[in-house]
Amino acid sequence: MGSEDHSAQNPSCKIMTFRPTMDEFRDFNRYVAYIESQGAHRAGLAKIIPPKEWKPRQTYDDIDDVVIPAPIQQVVTGQSGLFTQYNIQKKAMTVGEYRRLANSEKYCTPRHQDFDDLERKYWKNLTFVSPIYGADISGSLYDDDVAQWNIGNLRTILDMVERECGTIIEGVNTPYLYFGMWKTTFAWHTEDMDLYSINYLHFGEPKSWYAIPPEHGKRLERLAIGFFPGSSQGCDAFLRHKMTLISPIILKKYGIPFSRITQEAGEFMITFPYGYHAGFNHGFNCAESTNFATLRWIDYGKVATQCTCRKDMVKISMDVFVRILQPERYEQWKQGRDLTVLDHTRPTALSSPELSSWSASRTSIKAKLLRRQISVKESRPWRKAEEERRREPTRRPGPASHRRRSQPKKSKPEESRSPGEATAGVSTLDEARGCSRGEAMPEDEEEEELLPSQGHEAEGVEEDGRGKPRPTKARNKKKTPSPSSPPLLSAPPALFPTEEVLRPPPQPKSPGPAMGPMAAEGGPPPTPLNVVPPGAPVEEAEVRPRPIIPMLYVLPRTSSTDGDREHSAHAQLAPMELGPEEENQAQAGDSQGTTPFSKLKVEIKKSRRHPLGRPPTRSPLSVVKQEASSDEEAFLFSGEDDVTDPEALRSLLSLQWKNKAASFQAERKFNAAAALSEPYCAICTLFYPYSQSVQTERDSAVQPPSKSGQRTRPLIPEMCFTSSGENTEPLPANSYVGEDGTSPLISCAHCCLQVHASCYGVRPELAKEGWTCSRCAAHAWTAECCLCNLRGGALQRTTEHRWIHVICAIAVPEVRFLNVIERNPVDVSAIPEQRWKLKCIYCRKRMKRVSGACIQCSYEHCSTSFHVTCAHAAGVLMEPDDWPYVVSITCLKHRASGAGGQLLRTVSLGQIVITKNRNGLYYRCRVIGTTAQTFYEVNFDDGSYSDNLYPESITSRDCLRLGPPPEGELVELRWTDGNLYRARFISMATSLIYQVEFEDGSQLTVKRGDIFTLEEELPKRVRSRLSLSTGTPQEPSFSGDDVKAAKRPRVASVLATTTEDTGRSPEYLSFMESLLQAQGRPGAPF
C-alpha cells in the first residue's frame, strides 16, 4: 500500500474507488489512513470494494420476519430542482411485507435504458408517489464471527464516547439498518458532529450518491441559505435537518463542484468529515451504516455547527477527545482560545503517542476485568436456570409497564438479577424473550449494568444493584408498545462479539431451530442478526461487550409522530462496583484523568437520521375559499368603523386611501418618515412589523440621522424576487448585493422614497445623488398600486403599463418580475380570478367595490384575506419562506394562538379564568394565589440536558445570592442521585404557578399555560369540553351571554374585543398619527 505516489493527493477532488487485498482489508483504521494518503478524503466520499472471499453474512434468506418498527413515508414538495423532504411515520411492518410493497407496481423501479435515464426520471418524478423508507433500524446483519470491517465493531477513537463518557448513541456508535425502495432518498447533509460514516450495501438494487468536496462545502451552504431563507433564519445549521434536496442541474448552474457514483451490492461507501452528500435508492435493497472517527476528525468536531432549534439532535462532548488526545491544547480549548483552522487536504495520522498510551492502559485493565468476570460467573450455580429459561421458545410479547427512567428506583439483590439484560428506548430484552400479555415487568429486568471496555471493546458484566440514574431530562416520557405489532424473531439477541484474543475457549454449539421456511434442511441455519442459538452456552454471550440495541427484536413504537419526544427516549444503565484489587488497577490505569470505571454509567440514546416532519397543507399558488361570516366574527375592524374615536382614525387614513383625492405631498411624508425608521428601506419593511419601528422610536430620544448612502444588509432574500409565478430560475446569476451581503441605501430626489439599490434593482453606477425612482422618472404623480387600496411607497411599472408596489409583487405568489435583476417590468397576468374576488378584512367596508388582489394566511386552510399593504399596516406577521413558498403569512388570530407563552396575558389575583378540573372538563374559576419558580437549563458533558434544575442545585456558585451564572459557563451541580456533575449553563426560565378555586370550593394548582383568560380565544379542544355548570348553587354567578358565546361553533376572536385588534391598538394609532403630523418623524411606507 505504500508504493503509490502520495504527492498527487487527488487535486481534482473526484470520488476514488479502492480494491484492497485480504491482508490490506484486515486493519480498518490502517486502510482508512491509507486511502486518505491517496487523497480520497478530498472528494468527501470514497468507494471500497472488499475482497471476493470476504462475506459479512452467509445468506439473507432468513430475515423476512424482522420487524421494521417505524417506516417513514417521504413526501417531497418543491419545483425547478429545489425540494424539501418531509418524513411521516407509518405503521410497523416486516421485511417480507416491505419487500412485496417495494416490488409492487406502485413503488417498483420504472423501466429505464441506463443510469442517466433513471436519474432523469428520479428528479422529474420526485414529488409524485411518495415512497416508504425502512430507515433508522438499530441492529446489524453481520454474522458473529466476522472480524474485518464489522460495522458494529470498527474499533476507532469514536469508541471513547462509550468508554469514557458511558454514552451509546444508536446509529452513531452502533449500527443502523436501512431497507429502501425506488426513490427513497437521503437529503443533503454532513454527518452529525461532522464525523466519518461507513455504509455497506448488503443486497438489492444499487444506491446513487452525490458528494461535494469538503473544501467547497461552504459554497453549498451559502446557496442553500439563498434558496431556503425561512429555514436558515430559524436555524443556522438547518441542513442538519436532512430535508433539503438540490438537483445536480442547480449545482452546475451555480458552479458548485460535485461528483456522483453508484454503489452496488457488496460495496462500502465512506464519507469524510464535512463532506456533504445526498442520494437515492434504485429499488429494494438493504444497507447498514454507522459513524466512526480518526485523529483528523477531532479538529472538525470542535468547530462543527450545531442545530439550535431541536434539542434531540446528536451532540457529542469533545472534552474527552481534546483532554486525552490533545492534552497540550486542552486548557486553551476550555478557555475558547484554541483557534482551529481546518485543512481539508491533510490526511489523517494512524496513531499518536497519546492514543497509544490510552489504548495500552485500557487493554491492561480490560484483561483483568474479563478474568474476574469469568471466575465469578463460574461460581454461580443459578446460571443454569437462567440458561434453561433462555432456551425456551420466544412467545409473542404483549404490552408491559415501564418505570420512568428519570426517577431513582430500588434495586434487588445481585443474586436475583439475570445477566445480559439491556434496554433500548422503552424496550427490554425480556420483551423479546416473550413476556406474556399483561404480565408486569420485573424491576430487575429494566436496567443492565455495564463496565466500559479498555482499548476498543466493552465488556458485559454482572449487576450489584447499587446503580443510580444518570442526569437527564426529568420530564422524559416513555412509550408503551402496541400489542398488535408483527411477531418478532424466535431467538433472543446476543451482545456484540469481543476481541478474539480475550474470548474464553469456544464451546460446541447445538443446532438451533430453523428461522424460517427458507432455512436449509439437514443442518443449522446461519445465525440471523447476531442472535445466539438456543443451544449456545450462556457464558459465550455474557462476555460480549456492549448491549445490542434490540430494536430488531422488540415491538415497534406506535406513538405519535412527534420526533422530539421520540428522540429523547433513552435507557439508564447502572455501574458495577469493582473489588478492591480491580478498583485499584482501574484507578492506577486512569493516567489520563478519565472517569473511573467503577463509577461510569452507560446511557443509550436514540438518534434519527431521518427526522420526522410535517409537509405543508396546500401549494403556494392555492386560494382558499373565503368564509365571509367567519372573517367578520374574527375581525370587526373595517378601517374606519367600530373604533372609539372614528374621526381621529378617519383623519389618519383618509389621505392614503385610493377612494380619496391623490396627494403627492402626503406620500412624500410617508416616504420621508419611513426613511428614518428601521429598516430604512421601503421594501424591506415588508418583513419588519410596525410595532418594532414604534418601539425603536419610543426608546430613542434623539431623532436618527438620514441613512441615505450607507450600506446595510437587505431583509428581502434574493429568492423572493425570483420564485413567483412561472419563474424557473430560483436565483439570478448576479445581483446588486455586495460580497459582504450589503447594499447601499438610495433616496429618490422627488418623492423621498428610500430603498436598497438591490431591492429596487438599481445598478451600482446609478446609485448616486439625484437618483429618481421609476414612478418619478415617468412623472406619474398620481400613480397607485393595482393590487391594493393604499398609495405611496416603492412602485414599479407592470407589463400593462400600470403600477404596483414592489412589496405587493413579492407577496402575491402569481406575480413575477420579468427582469429579475432590475425588478421590472412586473407581470400580473397570472393572478387567478379567485384571488381578485377575495375581500380584504381590513378595508372591505371602507371601499364601495372590491378591488386589488388579496393574500391569505399561510396557516393550514385559513381563509383570512387581506391586501399586502393593509396587512402590513395592521401588523400581520410576514416572513421569508422556503422555496417555492416566497412569503409566510400569519394572521393575527393564528399569531396569537401559536405564540405560546410569549404572548400570554398577565393573570392577577381575583381574576376569573378558565382551566381544567380533575374530571377533565373546563370550568370558570377564580385565581386565589400565585407564585413563581425559577429553573435553570444546563447541558451535561455527555450531551444530555436538564431544563428544570433548581438554582440551589448548583454548588460552584451561590445562585440564590448572586443570580444565574453567565451563559456558557461551566458549573458544578449536585444531581438527584447525590453525585456531583459538571455542566454548562444555558439559560434561566421562570414558571408561574397559580392556585385557583372552582365554584364548588375545590382548589387546584396549575401552570400559566393551562389557564385561559376570558379575553383569549379558546382552542377547539377547550371549547368542546367547556362546562357551564358544576352542579352547585353558585352557577348563576358565572353564567351569561359571554359564556354561551364560548359554546358557539366559532368563537369571536380576541382581536375583536381587546387592544390586540389592529384598529384599536394604541401603538398602531399613535404610529399612524405620527405619519401625518410632522415631516421627518418615523412613518409607515407603502
Swiss-Prot record:
Binding site for Fe cation: 189, 191, 277
Location of this chain's protein in the cell: Nucleus
Span of zinc fingers (PHD-type): 719-777, 838-895
Comp. bias regions, Basic and acidic residues: 379-395, 456-467
Biased composition (Low complexity): 512-522
Domain Tudor: 905-962, 963-1019
Cofactor(s) this protein requires: Fe(2+)
Compositionally biased residues, Polar residues: 585-597, 1026-1037
Entry-linked CDD domains: Tudor_JMJD2B_rpt1
Residues at which 2-oxoglutarate binds: 133, 199, 207, 242
E.C. designation(s): 1.14.11.66
Domain JmjN: from-to ranges: 15-57
Keyword vocabulary terms for this entry: Acetylation, Chromatin regulator, Dioxygenase, Iron, Metal-binding, Nucleus, Oxidoreductase, Repeat, Transcription, Transcription regulation, Zinc, Zinc-finger
GO cellular component labels: cytosol; nucleoplasm; pericentric heterochromatin
Zinc finger intervals, C2HC pre-PHD-type: 782-815
Ranges of biased composition (kind: Acidic residues): 441-450
Extent of Basic residues compositional bias: 401-410, 468-480
Family stated for the protein in its record: Belongs to the JHDM3 histone demethylase family.
Function: Histone demethylase that specifically demethylates 'Lys-9' of histone H3, thereby playing a role in histone code. Does not demethylate histone H3 'Lys-4', H3 'Lys-27', H3 'Lys-36' nor H4 'Lys-20'. Only able to demethylate trimethylated H3 'Lys-9', with a weaker activity than KDM4A, KDM4C and KDM4D. Demethylation of Lys residue generates formaldehyde and succinate. Plays a critical role in the development of the central nervous system (CNS).
Stated name of the protein: Lysine-specific demethylase 4B
Gene: Kdm4b
